[in-house]
């Protein structure tokens, strides 16, 4: 019996060492098949969401599980019924993680522990024990406690020598809305004391609230693509589901995706979207023209703009008509009047910017672009107008206008990609100024901080990418200003965080920006709401001998490989009233240690 256990331990150690080396060399990412129907993943910290609340934050870890069902493993009868067809279709989709029987999982952890015990000379042949990453095993909750995860992690000394093993057991039940079934904090403390013989204990609380799920912003413009949650951490927990005290450390987690139809900056997004269409057309040679929002043709609108400027030269008009000017302003920043606008309208649009505003909503073909620029160039050549442009503008059209001041315009052929490039250039110039006006106008950034994003020394495609970054930053800041009513003291550090991230990273709307904040600033958003996650940690011991018992409630299923009995109430309740209760999954993480010497 012992010989068999030793052999199993050596085989596991050799397998885990081998796949770890493969991953380090970049040869494979797995999963790696072990015996029979068991497979192992090697994952990096932060890449295993199911374990984010349970593991201790190791850089690399193993996850062992049962190999998922596949079409190859499950040939179906030709005479399958509807249920069989449904099963067949489910196999074609991404396979769900499968759990290992809890008893088998314990045996794997036993083998893992044996290989790390320096006293087991017969296993390591006198060679120093090689420390492997932590091992976590998905369990099927087949035991009485409902164990869904088992984990083991070597305890190392300051000299990187193995002195013991730390074990974690994760049990889960639920879902339930019956709070009377939750243990009291005193009973959890007592259980921890009896398990670890601890006299000195401390408690630490954690709670996460979904601010867009609260009554304050119900029916707001933010949909599921965007989320703002707040994490609270505090010491000295008083009771289960305690409201985070105002002395808690609070952090906002902000993820915003552009394109919400009712966003305060949706009109700016649409303008950017057209810019992206042009950039893609320049890159591929094929342009997917969006539907126009103007009833008049692009040529008519541009001709009307030129006529106004001609009349100004002839002294018949002192400015572009008031009606058109107001329309251009509204194009720049159309904001829901029910929400105080964060965007300030620009009143200093030059000719190129006004031309962009006309063309972006009316051109529907390459020929439209050519015809519009032909009208402009002819008017400039004949001296019919002398439009003003912003100093420093580097677009092709701006250079032509500057040359027209001296009656010495260079010849320009509107063929090939030139017209598309000219339109993209004036759009980039205009939008850069819009974003500068916003961030500098709100004292959120200086010109020097924004210089990277508006630089013209890089190619057009890179300029477009940087403008996309500016827009995402704007969306993030606007959400916090419009819906959380955050003031300058919070928006300024948030903007600086966004600027720093986007100077070093590519555009990524899935990135979660974090902002430390005083709980009192956002108290109205969470004090009458239910937490999405609530957790208490009971801690005793110090350093390597620290042990912890964690008990938590989550509104979402905490593990993806175990099925739970569903109660009569909906699992994903929407909190829209004070009398509604949230359904929770109770989870407990227990810790134990074994010391080898």
Curated annotation (Swiss-Prot):
CC annotations in GO: RZZ complex
UniProt keyword list: Cell cycle, Cell division, Centromere, Chromosome, Kinetochore, Mitosis
Compartments, record wording: Chromosome, Centromere, Kinetochore
GO BP terms in the entry: cell division; mitotic spindle assembly checkpoint signaling
Principal place of residence: nucleus
Disulfide bond positions: none
Entry-linked Pfam families: Zwilch
Domain of life: Eukaryota
Record flagged with keyword Protein biosynthesis: no
Function: Essential component of the mitotic checkpoint, which prevents cells from prematurely exiting mitosis. Required for the assembly of the dynein-dynactin and mad1-mad2 complexes onto kinetochores.
Family of the protein in this entry: Belongs to the ZWILCH family.
UniProt subunit comment: Component of the RZZ complex composed of kntc1/rod, zw10 and zwilch.
Name used for this protein in its record: Protein zwilch homolog
Originating organism: Xenopus tropicalis (Western clawed frog)
């Amino acid at each position: 019996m012992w010989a068999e256990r030793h052999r199993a331990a050596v085989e596991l150690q050799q397998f885990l060492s081998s796949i770890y080396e493969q991953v380090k060399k970049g040869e494979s990412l797995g999963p790696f098949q072990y015996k029979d129907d068991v497979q192992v993943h090697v994952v990096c910290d932060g890449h295993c969401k199911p374990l984010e609340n349970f593991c201790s934050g190791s850089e690399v870890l193993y996850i062992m599980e049962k190999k998922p069902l596949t079409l190859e493993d499950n040939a179906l009868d030709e005479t399958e019924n509807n249920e069989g067809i449904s099963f067949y279709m489910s196999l074609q989709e991404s396979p769900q993680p499968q759990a290992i029987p809890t008893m088998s999982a314990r045996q794997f952890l036993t083998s893992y522990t044996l290989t790390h015990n320096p006293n087991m000379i017969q296993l390591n042949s006198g060679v120093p024990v090689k420390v492997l990453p932590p091992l976590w095993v998905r369990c099927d909750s087949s035991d009485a406690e409902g164990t869904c995860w088992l984990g083991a992690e070597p305890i190392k000394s300051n000299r990187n020598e193995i002195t013991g093993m730390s074990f974690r057991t994760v049990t889960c039940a639920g879902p339930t809305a019956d709070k009377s079934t939750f243990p009291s904090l005193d009973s959890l403390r007592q259980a921890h004391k009896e398990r670890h013989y601890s006299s000195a204990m401390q408690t630490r609380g954690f709670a996460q609230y979904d601010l867009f799920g609260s009554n304050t912003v119900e029916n707001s413009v933010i949909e599921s693509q965007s989320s703002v949650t707040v994490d609270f951490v505090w010491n000295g927990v008083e009771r289960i589901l305690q409201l985070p005290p105002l002395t808690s450390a609070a952090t906002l987690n902000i993820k915003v995706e552009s394109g919400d139809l009712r966003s305060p900056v949706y009109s700016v997004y649409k303008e950017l979207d057209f810019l992206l269409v042009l950039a893609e057309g320049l890159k591929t040679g094929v342009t997917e023209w969006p539907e126009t929002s103007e009833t008049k043709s692009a040529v008519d609108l541009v001709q009307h703009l030129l006529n106004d400027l001609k009349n100004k030269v002839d002294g018949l008009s002192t400015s572009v008509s008031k009606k058109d000017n107001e329309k251009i302003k509204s194009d720049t920043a159309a904001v829901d009047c029910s929400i105080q606008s964060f965007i300030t309208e620009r009143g200093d649009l030059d000719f190129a910017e006004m031309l962009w505003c006309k063309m972006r909503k009316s051109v529907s073909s390459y020929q439209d672009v050519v015809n519009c620029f032909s009208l402009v160039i002819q008017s400039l050549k004949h001296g019919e107008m002398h439009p003003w442009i912003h100093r420093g503008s580097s677009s092709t059209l701006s250079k032509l206008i500057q040359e027209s001041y001296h009656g010495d315009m260079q010849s320009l052929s509107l063929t090939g990609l030139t017209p598309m490039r000219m339109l993209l250039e004036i759009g980039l110039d205009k939008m850069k100024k819009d974003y500068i006006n916003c961030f500098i106008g709100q004292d959120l950034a200086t010109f020097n901080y924004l210089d990277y994003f508006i630089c013209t020394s890089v190619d057009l495609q890179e300029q477009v990418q940087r403008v996309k970054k500016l827009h995402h930053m704007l969306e993030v800041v606007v959400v916090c200003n419009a819906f959380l009513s955050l003031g300058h003291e919070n928006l300024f550090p948030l903007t600086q965080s966004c600027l720093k991230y986007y100077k070093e990273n590519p555009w990524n709307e899935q990135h979660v920006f974090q902002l430390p904040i005083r709980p009192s600033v956002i108290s109205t958003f969470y004090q009458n709401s239910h937490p999405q996650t609530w957790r208490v940690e009971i801690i005793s011991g110090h350093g390597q001998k620290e042990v912890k018992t964690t008990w938590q409630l989550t509104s979402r299923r905490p593990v993806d490989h175990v099925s739970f009995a569903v109660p009569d109430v909906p699992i994903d309740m929407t909190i829209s009233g004070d009398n509604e209760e949230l359904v929770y999954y109770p989870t407990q993480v227990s810790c134990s240690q074994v010391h080898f010497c």
